[in-house]
Amino acid sequence: MEMKWKFFLLIIPFLTGCVMEHNAYRVADVTLKDSQPCISVDNDPTLNDGQAKLLTLSLSARDAKGEMQEVWKQDSFDNPTYTIQAGQCIPVKYPFKGDDEYSVTVITAQPTDKVSTKRLWSRNFKINELTPE
């Protein structure tokens, strides 16, 4: 009987799960502007004072095998200089195709050395399914 109680007490935290108060994951905004995707981030207190820096922007495309493969990346993780403004388009120099499926991941931080302010935005999209701005 005592073993059942120990098991019950141990299993409760696993069944209830963990509520993440400061979830680092967000959904990136992707719209169509001048026939090109406009990738932006918004709705986060770390962006409010205009000091958040772009650490990484990664773009992947679905290949012929149906797998996502990285096709473009801007990596400034060690020395970030680009300041992110909420709702501002982040430049991506890549020749997008209308029917291809893409996945974008944006990582920001403010200040860059503070782990608790790192945020990750992600989104899958197709150019021909985006809403024009």
Regions found by a protein language model. Give the residues of each.
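Contiguous beta-strand segments within globular domains
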Residues: 24-51
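C-terminal motif of bacterial Sec signal peptides marking the signal peptidase cleavage site
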Residues: 14-17
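Acidic, low-complexity Ser/Thr/Gly/Pro-rich repeat segments typical of extracellular/periplasmic
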Residues: 42, 46-133
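Hydrophobic alpha-helical segments, principally membrane-spanning helices and signal/leader peptides
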Residues: 1-2, 25
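Bacterial signal peptide processing site
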Residues: 19-21
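Secretory-pathway extracellular proteins and peptide precursors enriched for disulfide-bonded cysteines
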Residues: 9-10, 29-30, 79-82
